A protein has these predicted regions:
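Surface-exposed, gly/pro-biased binding rims or lids
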Residues: 181-190
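Short aromatic-glycine-enriched beta-strand elements
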Residues: 13-15, 161-167
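Non-catalytic linker/capping segments at the edges of enzyme domains
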Residues: 12-103
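A mid-sequence, solvent-exposed acidic-amphipathic segment
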Residues: 73-140
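Hydrophobic beta-strand-centered segment that forms part of the acyl-chain substrate-binding groove
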Residues: 1-5, 9-11, 112, 116-151, ...
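A structural microfeature
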Residues: 25, 178-180
Length: 190
């Protein structure tokens, strides 16, 4: 649920998040994550952007992270497509000032959002719309708004409607800022 209050309740291993009486999410410490691949170069990432699926093919064109209907500052506009020379998808991202805290650093919730959709495009979202079922991640640093970053995603596995992916955000020179491991579920065809 967006643009509405969510009730947060402390649980044994983390937190539970409720929309009214409906449990919509849980959180818990993620523990160790495997190291991500080396970062694609900014040029490879820009090449990935040029291979992002066409706007009319996007299942969720108003998505905050990857929606082509979003304007700069209203959404992240991450358009991760297959990047030549990198086994996955990538894009260059320059976080807008609207996504920074008072200290000029990109807010953690924005980094978590940026880790989301690249995983879907790495596992075939353009062909089969999916939703995120689980994400585990680590934020290693908070970049400054206006920094030139590289966002990447890669495929781990496919099992029926389940798909595993990893994502990462790197500095322009390849230093890891944040990473995630994800489980995506294909939507059932109508």
């Amino acid at each position: 649920p967006l643009d509405k209050p969510i009730r947060v309740v402390s649980a044994a291993q983390g937190f539970e998040f409720f929309d009214g009486d409906t449990l919509v999410a849980t959180s818990a410490p993620s523990g160790f994550l495997p190291p991500p691949p080396d970062a694609p170069t900014p040029d490879q990432a820009l090449n990935g952007r040029s291979h992002f699926p066409p706007e009319e093919a996007h299942a969720f064109p108003s998505c905050f992270v990857c929606g082509p209907h979003r304007k700069v500052g209203d959404g992240l506009r991450l358009f991760t497509g297959p990047a030549d020379g990198f086994d996955g998808v990538a894009d260059v991202w320059v976080p807008a000032p609207e996504f920074a805290g008072d200290d000029g650093r990109v807010r953690p919730e924005i980094l978590w959002a940026a880790l989301d959709c690249p995983g879907a495009f790495a596992v075939g979202f353009g062909d089969n719309p999916m939703v995120l079922a689980r994400i585990a991640g680590n934020l290693h640093a908070l970049p400054t708004a206006g920094d030139r970053l590289v966002v990447a995603g890669w495929h781990h596995f496919h099992d029926g409607r389940k798909h595993g992916a990893g994502t990462a955000i790197y500095t322009g020179d390849g230093q890891l800022i944040a990473q995630s491991e994800q489980l995506w579920i294909e939507l059932k065809k109508a």
